[in-house]
Design a protein with these regions (language model features):
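Residues on the lipid-exposed face of transmembrane beta-strands in outer-membrane beta-barrel proteins
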Residues: 30-32, 71-75, 85, 126-130, ...
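Transmembrane beta-barrel architecture of outer-membrane proteins
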Residues: 25-27, 66-70, 121-125, 168-172, ...
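Transmembrane beta-barrel strands of outer-membrane/channel proteins
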Residues: 30-36, 85-89, 142-148, 189-193, ...
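Extracellular/periplasm-exposed beta-strand and loop segments of Gram-negative cell-envelope proteins
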Residues: 38-66, 89-122, 148-168, 196-204, ...
Length: 245
């Protein structure tokens, strides 16, 4: 569930307020809230010429679901133009006993070894949206954005700590559609993604897909609540690391 706060806008800029849905006349919109993703985290890391195991941080290391915060900012200089800024910090940690032999960063972790595992996944999204169709009861727009993703996984035992880190700027294209069945309720669906096929670059490859559908109930022009479903998937390889999140 997300709490939505939006600043007011001058009526002559967007048209008569009576023609617009509640909460649609704004210059700046700030959303802050929580979401509870189902963890699906697989990472492999090689070192010293030794291939790494595909480690499932859920089944192998006991990572469990938890809630995370999210911040979204929308800057709207014109009726059909939106600049988008999103930040999603994700961090999991767990303590477990290895149930099968794992190899990570060239180090073997045998059955029975106690491991403290941590994985962080931070994503920034900077984008621009242009609404090619904009009506009083909804709009349809195209999105171009750049995502900056940083993933770090670490295993800590009595013998030492090993970690793998992958950073990548990822361009993405997408689309968004919103409809207002009534003036106080907006229903939105958006998707962005990018795919770099294998063979284009021998060091990097993979895909990133972000799908979001949600409803926004606006109590006033400045306050509303939002609830919905989001799927955020990334898979790829970065030199000696591969990830599937």
């Amino acid at each position: 569930t997300l709490l939505t706060l939006a600043s007011s806008a001058e009526a002559q800029f967007f048209g008569q307020p009576s023609d617009l849905p509640i909460g649609e006349a704004y210059h700046v919109e700030i959303l802050g809230g929580m979401w509870n993703p189902t963890p699906s985290l697989t990472i492999s890391s090689e070192a010293f010429g030794i291939a790494g195991t595909d480690i499932d941080f859920t089944s192998d290391l006991g990572i469990a679901a938890k809630r995370f915060s999210e911040v979204r900012v929308r800057l709207r200089p014109g009726r059909k133009h939106r600049f988008r800024i999103d930040y999603v910090p994700i961090r999991y940690s767990a303590q477990s006993v290895v149930g099968r032999r794992l190899v990570f960063r060239g180090i073997a972790y045998d059955v029975g070894v106690s491991v403290n595992s941590t994985i962080t996944w931070n994503t920034w999204r900077l984008g621009y949206e242009y609404d090619i169709v904009h009506r009083s009861h909804g709009y349809f727009g195209l999105i171009v954005e750049a995502k900056y993703t940083e993933v770090e996984a670490s295993l800590d035992t009595q013998f030492g700590r090993e970690f793998a880190r992958a950073r990548a700027p990822i361009p993405a294209l997408g689309a968004v559609m919103r409809i207002y069945p009534v003036r106080v309720l907006g229903i939105t669906a958006e998707i962005t993604g990018f795919r770099l096929p294998e063979g284009v670059d021998q060091s990097y490859g993979g895909e990133y897909i972000d799908f979001d559908v949600y409803g926004t109930l606006n109590f006033t022009e400045k306050i509303g609540v939002q609830i919905g479903y989001r799927s955020l998937d990334m898979s790829g390889f970065f030199e000696t690391e591969s990830v599937d999140l």
